[in-house]
């Protein structure tokens, strides 16, 4: 069984400018997580395929980096246009391969287009500097140049956007790229980004994609001698492994790690309770809660706790859940049976540890209806760990200081939100939260292509978007010139 995207066989891998079958003995079966139908079957990539992709990238990179900035900009901008031109086809792929709802799929394409347009400006924004020397007659030039070849490992939750978030800036500043998409989303995370940039005019070899089992090619993809940077988005345990391999598994290379989250959504005593309750319902359950920035914990000042909980529960009970292809659905299926099993265990453990069930929807196949737990304490697993599903906990804070303490009671620090009618008060509170990103009177799920994105603690290393992406995907080189 085969499937296509933009006129090419979507079961193939783009390696060195050619769409080819993988050379692994393993066959990948691409499953629709909602109805369990088989989308396609394909031969996975092998270690030899990884070698071929990296060697093609190494061979093509220097010429690509030497391509005039205006030409690179035009190609990257054309990729953004192609994302829009192929929007409907991509939406259908995101729905059937990743379980995205129609609204989430459209949002994802918009986000991918935005970072691609932003990246189109990067070739003209890469600047070096000339520094004075303490030696007479000497000049110090610091050039900012492309890393070389970048390996991109992308996840299954926002596969298109979280591939392109690394691919577009990396290409724009002169790198070549090899993508290893998640096994659940080889098309939306690998084939589609590769095809879009190929169609836009990126030369052969500058972008490749190899979809294969992590157990077969994962370590080799990271430890290979060619890439100078591995950009990984995924879970914290796997991210730790990637970091260790990048340092200890072969020639040392840098890493950009965007990992897990456990986002707190803090409702202070003077918050707009109606607005906060509605926002929390969306921020917790968008894409089934399978977003690193999803609200995991709602922390509410005791003075407004009961009022908020009542309105939040009411909002959650009205969330449309079901077929992701239907207009208006907010919660669709979780990605696979492993995720489903983990969520079932978390639900039972929350009950066992003493949480009160406020909302407990049914579980139908991989469709997990929203669950809300109250009377949660910070030592319970549902509050400590990233959930990555449609489960949310509500914690009561004694006061503002206690709310800050609860917000920081996590090993993660990716995104957070605080709600208050007093903006200055909220801003001061935000500075107390050890998180890479904090949003006031807004969702924890936020991304703008020109604004820094990244976390603290166990949520990762490195920064994406705008000037921060330029720095991430380039390196400095000092050329000292002694004239006399």
UniProtKB/Swiss-Prot annotation:
Active site: 258, 292
PROSITE patterns, sorted: ALDEHYDE_DEHYDR_GLU
Result after altering residue 180 to A: Less than 50% of the activity of the wild-type with vanillin as substrate in the presence of NAD(+). Less than 10% of the activity of the wild-type with vanillin as substrate in the presence of NADP(+)
pH dependence: Optimum pH is 7.0 for the NAD(+)-dependent oxidation of vanillin.
One Pfam short name: Aldedh
Binding site for NADP(+): 156-157, 180-183, 234-235, 259, 386
Coiled coil: none
EC number: 1.2.1.67, 1.2.1.64, 1.2.1.96
UniProt cross-references to InterPro entries, sorted A to Z: Ald_DH/histidinol_DH, Ald_DH_C, Ald_DH_CS_GLU, Ald_DH_N, Aldehyde_DH_dom
Subunit structure: Exists as a homodimer, homotrimer and homotetramer.
Described purpose of this protein according to its UniProt entry: Catalyzes oxidation of vanillin to vanillate. Also oxidizes 3,4-dihydroxybenzaldehyde and 4-hydroxybenzaldehyde significantly. Other aromatic aldehyde substrates in the order of decreasing activity include 3-hydroxybenzaldehyde, 4-nitrobenzaldehyde, terephthalaldehyde, 2,4-dichlorobenzaldehyde, benzaldehyde and 3-phenylpropanal. Low activity with phthalaldehyde, cinnamaldehyde and syringaldehyde. No activity with phenylacetaldehyde, formaldehyde or aldehyde. Active with both NAD(+) and NADP(+). Involved in the degradation pathway of lignin-derived aromatic compounds of plant cell walls.
Protein name per UniProt: Vanillin dehydrogenase
Annotated organism of origin: Corynebacterium glutamicum (strain ATCC 13032 / DSM 20300 / JCM 1318 / BCRC 11384 / CCUG 27702 / LMG 3730 / NBRC 12168 / NCIMB 10025 / NRRL B-2784 / 534)
């Amino acid at each position: 069984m085969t499937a296509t995207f933009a006129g090419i066989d979507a079961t193939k891998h783009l390696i060195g400018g050619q769409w080819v079958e993988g050379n692994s003995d393993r066959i990948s079966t691409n499953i629709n997580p909602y109805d369990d139908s088989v989308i396609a079957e394909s031969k996975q990539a092998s270690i030899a395929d990884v070698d071929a992709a990296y060697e093609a990238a190494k061979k093509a990179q220097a010429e690509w980096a030497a391509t005039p900035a205006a030409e690179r900009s035009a190609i990257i901008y054309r990729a953004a246009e192609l994302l829009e031109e192929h929007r409907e086809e991509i939406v259908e792929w995101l729905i059937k391969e990743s379980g995205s709802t129609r609204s989430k799929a459209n949002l994802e394409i918009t986000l991918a287009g935005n970072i691609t347009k932003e990246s189109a400006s990067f070739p003209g924004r890469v600047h070096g500097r000339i520094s004075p020397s303490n030696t007479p007659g000497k000049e110090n030039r610091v050039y900012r140049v492309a890393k070389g070849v970048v390996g991109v490992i992308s996840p299954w939750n926002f596969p298109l956007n979280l591939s392109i978030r690394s691919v577009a800036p990396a290409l724009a500043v002169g790198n070549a790229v090899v993508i290893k998409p998640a096994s659940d989303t080889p098309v939306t995370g690998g084939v589609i980004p590769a095809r879009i940039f190929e169609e836009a005019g990126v030369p052969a070899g500058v972008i490749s994609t190899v979809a294969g089992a992590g157990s077969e090619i994962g370590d080799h993809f990271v430890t290979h001698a060619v890439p100078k940077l591995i950009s990984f988005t995924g879970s914290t345990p796997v991210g730790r492994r990637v970091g260790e391999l990048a340092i200890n598994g072969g020639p040392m290379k840098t890493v950009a790690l965007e990992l897990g989250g456990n986002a707190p959504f803090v409702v202070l005593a003077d918050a707009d309770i109606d607005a906060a309750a509605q926002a929390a319902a969306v921020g917790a359950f968008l894409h089934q809660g399978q977003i690193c920035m999803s609200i995991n914990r709602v922390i509410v000042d005791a003075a407004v706790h009961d009022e908020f909980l009542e309105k939040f529960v009411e909002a959650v009970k009205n969330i449309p859940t079901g077929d992701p292809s239907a207009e208006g659905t907010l919660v669709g299926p979780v990605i696979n049976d492993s995720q489903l099993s983990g969520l079932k265990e978390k639900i039972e453990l929350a009950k066992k540890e003493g949480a009160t069930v406020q909302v407990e929807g049914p579980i139908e196949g991989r469709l997990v209806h929203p669950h809300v737990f109250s009377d949660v304490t910070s030592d319970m697993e549902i509050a400590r760990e990233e959930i990555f599903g449609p489960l949310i906990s509500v914690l009561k804070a004694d006061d503002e200081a206690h709310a800050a303490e609860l917000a920081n009671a996590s090993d993660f620090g990716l995104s957070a939100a605080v709600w208050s009618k007093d903006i200055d008060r909220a801003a001061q509170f935000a500075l107390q939260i050890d998180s890479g990103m904090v949003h006031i009177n807004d969702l924890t799920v936020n991304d703008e292509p020109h604004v820094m994105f990244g976390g603290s603690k166990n949520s990762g290393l490195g920064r994406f978007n705008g000037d921060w992406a330029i720095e991430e995907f380039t390196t400095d080189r000092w050329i000292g010139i002694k004239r006399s």
